Amino acid sequence: MTFYILMNQITTMFLGLNLLTTISFDSEIVSYMYGGSKQEIFFQVTNNNRTLAIKPLMEGDFSNLLVITKEHKYYFDLKLTDKNSHQFIEVKNGIASHALSKKVKTKDYEILEGQASILFINNTNKEMMVNNIIVKQREYFSKGVPIILNGKRILN
């Protein structure tokens, strides 16, 4: 799975308790920082410093993760799940796409997908919380990442 991550957006990553998750980057990992304790999650940098392996060691609520590569910084919110966890993630840089096609349409919202981002359109008169960002009308988001609307995972 490929995540096209837009600058300064927090990406939610779902981890499985008995599953190794790898995140591969285009450039070398310089450092990473986890906000929780070492007893919660195992981390190891591999593959010529371009891949970070992650494995939860216990159940619970996890903290956030910052990964700094030679070219960019990436912010992750780590969550434990027993279904649809991420395994192999390739991280690319996202950009706001303008050639878009419809991916999801409901009476309340639409999700349009481009080559390196998605556009979330709010069709209501009320604000929506999407990936911890308030969307009044429309907002670009990283492509490939989970889309969480008002606390519920609706895509990826």
Place the predicted regions along the sequence by residue.
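A general "mature secreted/periplasmic domain" signal
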Residues: 1-156
